[in-house]
Amino acid sequence: MFAKTLASLAVIGSAAAYVPMMSMDMGRREVVQAGAAAAAVTPFLSGAPAGAAMDKSAKAPQITIFDHRGCSRAPKESTGGKAGGQDDEMMVKVASTKVTVSESDAAKKLQEFITFEKGIDGPFTSKN
């Protein structure tokens, strides 16, 4: 705790050294108040435990860009109001979709990635 207080006072002191107007205008009372404020805040600066959790929903953003400029087909993807310009023929759709991959596809990709790796001591195998 003493180290944190000392570090916060050092930061305040270095800020006062680089700002001449601040160091000229600060009296002893302001320095003591700043030090007291830093000492009061220091216990609250301790790190909080991380609240991150793995999202197991297997959802990923799916971005689809529609560009119907110059196309004779009537666009049916958008149901909103028209702007009256070429922007009526363009749209970006963003959806959160569930990603599904079969175990066999995953095994094939893993094998493909492993074959690309070669270490200093030879090809990568699961026994290395």
From Swiss-Prot:
Coiled-coil stretches noted in the UniProt entry, renumbered to this chain: none
Binding positions (15,16-dihydrobiliverdin): 71, 73, 77-78, 93
Subcellular location: Plastid, Chloroplast thylakoid membrane
Classification via InterPro entries: Globular_prot_asu/bsu, Phycoerythr-like_a_sf, Phycoerythr_a, TAT_signal
Residues the record lists as 5-hydroxylysine modifications: 56
GO cellular component: chloroplast thylakoid membrane; phycobilisome
Transmembrane is among the record's keywords: no
Protein keywords: Bile pigment, Chloroplast, Chromophore, Electron transport, Hydroxylation, Membrane, Photosynthesis, Plastid, Thylakoid, Transit peptide, Transport
Source species, domain of life: Eukaryota
Transmembrane annotation, as ranges: none
Membrane topology (UniProt): Peripheral membrane protein
Organelle targeting sequence: 1-52
PROSITE patterns: TAT
Sequence segments annotated as region (Disordered): 70-89
Modifications made to the protein after synthesis: Contains one covalently linked 15,16-dihydrobiliverdin chromophore.
Primary location recorded for the protein, binned into one broad class: plastid
BP GO terms, sorted: photosynthesis
Family affiliation: Belongs to the phycoerythrin family.
Protein role: Light-harvesting photosynthetic tetrapyrrole chromophore-protein from the phycobiliprotein complex.
Other comments on record: The light-harvesting system in Cryptophytes contains phycobiliprotein complexes. Unusually they are composed of either phycoerythrin (CPE) or phycocyanin (CPC) but never allophycocyanin (APC), with only one type of biliprotein being present in any one species. Unlike cyanobacteria or red algae these proteins are not arranged into higher-order phycobilisome complexes, and they are found in the thylakoid lumen.
Subunit structure: Heterotetramer of 2 different alpha chains and 2 identical beta chains. The subunit composition could comprise of any combination of 2 out of 4 different alpha units with an invariant beta unit.
Protein name, UniProt field: Phycoerythrin alpha-3 chain, chloroplastic
Gene symbol of the encoding locus: cpeA3
